[in-house]
């Protein structure tokens, strides 16, 4: 289910990359991304925000306990595909134009937020994470599936070299961002992480190191200094 949003366009356009990304999704799922996507979303409930929803590949995998999904996507071609995907989903989905650095949600309005292959490409990662923390209620979860800086020196060096040209070719994507450190620096508590390479090949491409994880906006102190989870 979906509703359209009359907000003015953000003007974020990557027409060539958007079409390549949309066509690559099913192939990536066949290679194993589908398993990671399902793990990313398992157990979510309540009101959820997905930033950089792309063409809506995640929509079919949200559990029925999700009562509303606010799907934010700035690229017009991908957003149109997401609206179509939302119409076929089993949960209520509101697809909107918007960017990670100014999320269209009130403070503490979400039970969870999802970032799937998006923190690599936001212009200001710290600001995007601050926005995600803002929209989460205390105790709310940030679910993330991202490609990140390698934990081996050789591949990390290759990533830094690749990033000279990679963002221009791949919709602003960076291969060498230390996203886990950025998440903790934004005030989140890391709950769980799993690092892996995808695709897992003998000669790994720069964007192959990935992390799948859960972080939490810390709960607010209770009346007597104890922590309360709403």
Label every PLM stretch briefly.
Residues 126-141:
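A short glycine-rich, Lys/Arg-flanked "PGG" loop and its adjoining helix->strand segment in the class I
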């Amino acid at each position: 289910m979906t509703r359209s949003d009359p907000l003015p366009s953000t003007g974020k356009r990557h027409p060539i990359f958007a079409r390549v990304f949309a066509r690559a999704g099913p192939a990536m799922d066949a290679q194993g991304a589908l398993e990671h996507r399902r793990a990313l979303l398992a157990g979510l409930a309540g009101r959820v925000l997905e930033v950089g929803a792309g063409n809506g590949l995640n929509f079919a995998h949200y559990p029925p306990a999700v009562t509303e999904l606010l799907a934010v996507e700035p690229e017009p071609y991908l957003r149109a595909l997401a609206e179509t995907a939302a119409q076929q989903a089993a949960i209520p989905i509101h697809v909107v134009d918007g960017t990670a650095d100014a999320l269209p949600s009130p403070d503490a309005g979400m039970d969870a937020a999802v970032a799937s292959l998006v923190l690599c490409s936001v212009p200001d990662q710290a600001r995007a994470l601050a926005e995600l923390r803002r929209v989460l209620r205390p105790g709310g979860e940030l679910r993330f599936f991202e490609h990140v800086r390698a934990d081996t020196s050789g591949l990390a060096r290759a990533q830094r070299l690749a990033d000279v040209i990679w963002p221009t070719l791949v919709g602003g994507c960076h291969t060498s961002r230390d996203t886990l450190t950025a998440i903790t620096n934004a005030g989140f508590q890391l709950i769980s992480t799993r690092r892996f390479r995808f695709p897992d090949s003998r000669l790994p491409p720069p964007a192959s190191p990935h992390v799948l994880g859960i972080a939490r906006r810390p709960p607010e102190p209770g009346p007597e200094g104890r922590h309360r989870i709403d």
